[in-house]
Amino acid sequence: MSLIKVPCMQITNMHCSGQTVSLAAGDYHATIVTVGAGLAELTFQGCHLVIPHKPEEMPLAHLGKVLIPWPNRIANGCYRYQGQEYQLPINEHSSKAAIHGLLAWRDWQISELTATSVTLTAFLPPSYGYPFMLASQVVYSLNAHTGLSVEIASQNIGTVAAPYGVGIHPYLTCNLTSVDEYLFQLPANQVYAVDEHANPTTLHHVDELDLNFTQAKKIAATKIDHTFKTANDLWEMTITHPQQALSVSLCSDQLWVQVYSGEKLQRQGLAVEPMSCPPNAFNSGIDLLLLESGKPHRLFFNIYGQRK
């Protein structure tokens, strides 16, 4: 593949995260890696808006990765579809689950480049655990006024309907400060309780689990690793660090969002993962998409920073 260079953008040679693309627009700078179509860095006025990782290293905790054809977990890596049972590889042994899909560690291809945007594409061939065929595309667009906009699209290019879900795994941060200091606001009034393997059990009102962030509230020592159902299918959440005078917002058009307080990353950021369905949807069927042959699905989200 020939490498294309345009002003304000540079593509590196191959490394652990594939290739690196640098984007810039106004006070925003973004680093995208081709492995997992991942968001490796996003800054605003020099401040980190997501926990970054070095492109030359394999990141922890699925930092910034695109999650296709399912987000989060499938319990025991097993599901039934149209009367047939399928077994996926278990890649999170602590929860005995197949986690975060099949494209998070695949190298995507760069198909379009500009100074402020990049389009990445991937082909997902059939496999024993997921015998369906998808073409996926991620478009990262950086704007000096609105920040980073991302569209994730997949199309079923097979001949039979495919079970499908999608998400993405950014860790929002107020310049790598502790989440304990953040004010967190999320317009979601329902949240799942989980079992000992982190699988969702019962949907509760957020007050029942003491996870009501519909009004901005300090996270403090609260540990969060829960799936929330948002009040609307177009929503915006915000974290704010008052002393840093910095806020980071994410908006999306999906009803579900996984929030994790980042214990694996020293609580330097909050994973906020827009998802088309909750965990284990391949078994529960809740908001599981059945992509007919030729049909597409799109997920949109946007991240931007503000100085208070």
Curated annotation (Swiss-Prot):
GO biological process terms on file: 6-sulfoquinovose(1-) catabolic process; galactose catabolic process via UDP-galactose, Leloir pathway; glucose metabolic process; single-species biofilm formation
Induction / repression: Induced during growth with sulfoquinovose.
GO molecular function annotation: aldose 1-epimerase activity; carbohydrate binding
Pfam families the UniProt entry points to: Aldose_epim (PF01263)
Domain of life according to the entry: Bacteria
Segments crossing the lipid bilayer: none
N-terminal signal peptide: none
Annotated coiled-coil segments of the chain: none
Classification via NCBIfam families: PRK15172.1
Protein's name according to its UniProt entry: Uncharacterized protein YihR
Lineage of source species: Bacteria, Pseudomonadati, Pseudomonadota, Gammaproteobacteria, Enterobacterales
